[in-house]
Amino acid sequence: MTRQPRVAVVGAGLAGLTAGLELARRGWRVDLYERSRLLGGKATSFEVDGHEVDCGQHVVLACCTATLELIDELGLRDSLYVQPRFEVTVLSRKRPPARLRASSLPAPLHLMAGFARYPHLTTLDRIRVGRALVAARTDVAPKGDMAAWLRRHHQSARALRAFWDPFLVPALNAPLDRVSAAMGLFVIRTAFLGDRDAARIAYLKVPLARLAEAAAARLDAVHLRQAVVGVHREGDRITGVKLSGGAGAACDACVIAVPPQRLNAMLDDAPALGVTGLDAFEAMPIVDVHLWYDRPVLGCDFAALLDSPVQWVFEKAPGYVCCSLSAADDLVQRPERELVELGRSELASVLPQAARARLLRGAATRDPDATFIPAPGVRRPGPDTALSNLVIAGAWTDTGWPATIESAVRSGRSAALTLFRNAASWPASESTRAGLAREVARAV
């Protein structure tokens, strides 16, 4: 009988869970290790005053095909809201609510009708934004940061605050002067220029923890509150993982799906294993403010805010809203009461119904290391290492996407596929090697 490999997956975020699923689907035995008590990593849920809340408001777009496939695989498609067509309500202190919506025309013409009626841009702004979108389609090797690219294409301060910032800053979780133009243009091309429906917004209507729980249920063993602090190595192979407290666990292969700083600490000599540049990654916080009112306050499912530290707000249930504050390095250290008051006052300033409603309770969630900053010159590693049975995964690795759920899922799949390809050359009995070779052929 062929013995399938036992693989240790370190990190129960979506990258690790996806890698584990890919391996388990082909018969590999998967041990999942997570140092916290929760599954899902940055896409998880927990209780606040008896309410299960997500650690942050995560959305995907229709172009996030790997994430949508994962949701389908785990049987959660019925719990997913997907816009029939891209449309966003935009709130401002200076004007009544406006809508930016796509038409039925093919991309990129589908945005033109929406721009023509968008009151936060002047006619000249609309023309220049349109020209910048055309330039984004053809500029395949941009230099410098995204803010500089926008300046070179004559984008006004008004266009920045009314269009570019509300969409790009949350997607990249960083100010545009700290983001590479290449990554900014990737977001523009993928969401707005490739397909008319690509920018449709989608999100789960159930707590995010359901996604992670459904994935973990398909693995052989899940070890929560079990930190992996290193790996055992014999020659050119990983033979096990080192656990906190001095214990160890044997494995035939290992997927490490943790942030770059933890990976650097976990590997004795990351550069010697072919994993370089980990010290160059900088993290950016995200803050979410959860507010419970005595009545519904938003009047729509979600909206973008202009000229506000609250970039987006979602009404997740009648009277319960989640305010998302991206690139929140100047807010993450504030006390919870200040963050709750900030969210309340910002909503009251643009929503008369929120100003009249009574706030029942509030809470803030903070992730000081939410995502890496995709700065110019940052080199993201792929899944391979110098050891054929050790791969890495994470939204920060080289998926081509910013640090999003989509990037995490894609990285997990890539790491698993890399192991499949490598496995055919591992020392094993002839029957095992033949079986692995067949698995590799099916995976590819």
Regions found by a protein language model. Give the residues of each.
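Glycine-rich FAD pyrophosphate-binding loop
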Residues: 24-48
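FAD-binding beta-loop-beta segment adjacent to the flavin cofactor pocket
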Residues: 311, 366-392, 396-399
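Mid-domain catalytic core of redox enzymes
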Residues: 2, 86, 92, 227-354, ...
